[in-house]
């Protein structure tokens, strides 16, 4: 059984464990590096700040074992009716069990509860499993995100309307 629940700043050790696992397992999928969150970067205040500065953070558990994570951020400035799906990761042992689907659905529900019109995300072009996951949930590729020349770092922007389904 998959359970997805919000994570609050006092649970920073859980978020830390999952985030470090994610950065070690899939460094190509994130904007930060494992080394940036280790050593001097591995401080309680920093983990708490990460959880406080992003509007929504959640973990997925399979039979009580942490299996994945995701965040949701409010759009701002030019996109106040948009939310953004960030930092989705599923532990290798939990892939193919619906954990990614549950995490995406949780962010979509969170965004709808905040009266957002769309949810957007950025995904590395080479991350085919993630792109397939997002397409299953109605996300559409709207083009390149940024001007990165290096093929392994190129990202695509995907958007999902919350009014289409």
Predicted regions and their residues:
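Extreme N-terminal starter segment of soluble prokaryotic enzymes
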Residues: 1-4
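Short loop or secondary-structure boundary microenvironments that flank
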Residues: 8-9, 123
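Acetyl-CoA-dependent GNAT
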Residues: 9-93, 104-106, 110, 141-145, ...
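Active-site acidic-Proline motif in GNAT/NAT acetyltransferases
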Residues: 91-93, 97, 125-126
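Charged, amphipathic alpha-helical coiled-coil/dimerization segments
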Residues: 96-97, 102, 108, 112-113, ...
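C-terminal "cap" of GNAT-fold acetyltransferases
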Residues: 117-131, 136-165
């Amino acid at each position: 059984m998959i359970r997805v629940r919000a994570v609050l700043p006092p649970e920073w050790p859980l978020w830390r464990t999952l985030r470090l696992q994610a950065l070690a397992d899939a460094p190509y999928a994130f904007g930060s590096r494992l080394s940036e969150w280790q050593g001097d970067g591995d401080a309680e205040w920093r983990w708490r700040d990460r959880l406080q500065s992003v509007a929504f953070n959640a973990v997925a558990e399979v039979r009580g074992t942490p299996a994945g994570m995701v965040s949701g951020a409010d759009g701002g400035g030019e996109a106040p009716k948009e939310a953004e799906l960030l930092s989705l990761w599923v532990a290798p042992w939990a892939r193919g069990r619906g954990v990614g689907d549950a995490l995406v659905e949780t962010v979509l529900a969170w965004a709808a509860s905040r009266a957002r019109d769309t949810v957007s995300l950025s995904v590395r072009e080479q991350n085919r499993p993630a792109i397939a996951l997002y397409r299953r949930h109605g996300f559409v590729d709207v083009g390149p995100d940024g001007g990165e020349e290096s093929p392994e770092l190129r990202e695509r922007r995907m958007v999902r309307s919350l009014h289409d389904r």
